A protein has these predicted regions:
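Conserved beta-strand in the GNAT
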Residues: 63, 69-78, 113, 118
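Conserved acetyl-CoA-binding loop-helix of GNAT-fold acetyltransferases
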Residues: 125-142, 161-165
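Active-site rim helix/loop that mediates acceptor-substrate recognition in acyltransferases
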Residues: 39-61, 66-67
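C-terminal "cap" of GNAT-fold acetyltransferases
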Residues: 146-160, 165-167, 173-188
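Conserved GNAT-fold acetyl-CoA-binding loop/helix
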Residues: 27-49, 86, 94-96
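Conserved GNAT acetyl-CoA-binding A-motif
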Residues: 110-112, 124, 140-151
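A short beta-loop-alpha structural element at the N-terminal edge
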Residues: 7-21, 32-33
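Conserved acyl-donor/pantetheine-binding loop and adjacent beta-alpha core of acyl/acetyltransferases
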Residues: 80-112, 116
């Protein structure tokens, strides 16, 4: 594939589909999404991304694009706002499915949390994920956050190595969707 120019920008409402795809890829378990949300889980995640007050809102996202085509996204927010953002997210899920999931808190106050990051498969291995992480981390720091956190599966040492190369360090563990995760932070 020819070297392409990558642009990182703030998301727009019209980016809801790539945000939905990024969230689904970050969750990583398509079967669980289908079992819980049905075949149209991307449509539900898109609706959540279009909301201004949800966890996965376009207002909380940065987009990687090439030739004006979105190819990846990073979603992050102030951990202190998790319950407020999750309430909107759960409301949309309930309105669609008649039930809400039970998800443990993966962040807390005092931390800007990188919730989801993903790049379309055909664009992986080109440093785009690294650009997205750096951009959302730097945005959080410029917005006044002293800590930027994320979680990474114990079974994903490549991702952990990437985060470590960007200055993130292990600060604890979390269990999320039955998976053991490292809680990592970048601290000023």
């Amino acid at each position: 594939m020819q070297q392409q120019t990558i642009n990182i920008r703030a998301a727009k409402k019209s980016d809801a589909v790539i945000i939905a795809r990024a969230v689904a890829m970050a969750i990583g378990d398509e079967n669980a999404l289908k079992n819980y949300c049905g075949e149209n889980y991307i449509t539900l995640l898109k609706q959540i991304a279009e909301s201004e007050k949800s966890q996965y809102s376009y207002l909380n996202a940065l987009i990687a694009e090439t030739n004006n085509t979105p190819i990846g996204a990073a979603i992050g927010y102030d951990g202190a706002k998790l319950h407020e953002l999750r309430a909107t997210t759960y409301s949309i899920i309930y309105d669609t499915l008649g039930r809400t999931p039970s998800i443990p808190d993966e962040t807390e106050g005092g931390e800007f949390y990188i919730d989801s990051i993903a790049v379309l498969p055909e664009y992986r291995g080109m440093g785009i994920g690294k650009q997205l992480i750096t951009a959302i981390r730097d945005k959080a720091l410029s917005d006044g956050h002293a800590r930027v956190g994320l979680i990474v599966d114990f079974d994903n040492p490549r991702a952990e190595q990437l985060y470590t190369s960007l200055g993130f360090t292990r600060v604890g563990t979390r269990t999320f969707f039955g998976h053991k995760m490292w809680h990592m932070q970048y601290i000023i």
